[in-house]
Amino acid sequence: MRLDDIIGDVIFLSFKNPERMQAIGIKELSGHYMLKGYDQMGLWLEHPGIKIQHMEDENGRPLPADQQFHEEIDAVFMVHWDNVDNMMHYPKRKGFDLP
């Protein structure tokens, strides 16, 4: 199997050093992520969710609690090759092996 064949699929990945991922909100030792691509530096994976809470208006003034809101941001993050411990793909598993 080649990585090119599973781009766009959901894979299982465990990290050698999960502390390196904490700065971007990934706190788990392992998880399931959509593989978006790869390069000489590592794997590009879809971030499971970044939420930003808007607490100020456009002028920097605090918003009342009932006007504050959350925004979900789409993001892709990199796992360097030296931080990949294990990787697993699920051929033909519904919801994981995507066309």
Report each predicted region and the residues it spans:
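Eukaryotic intrinsically disordered, low-complexity regulatory linkers and tails enriched in Ser/Thr/Pro
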Residues: 1-99
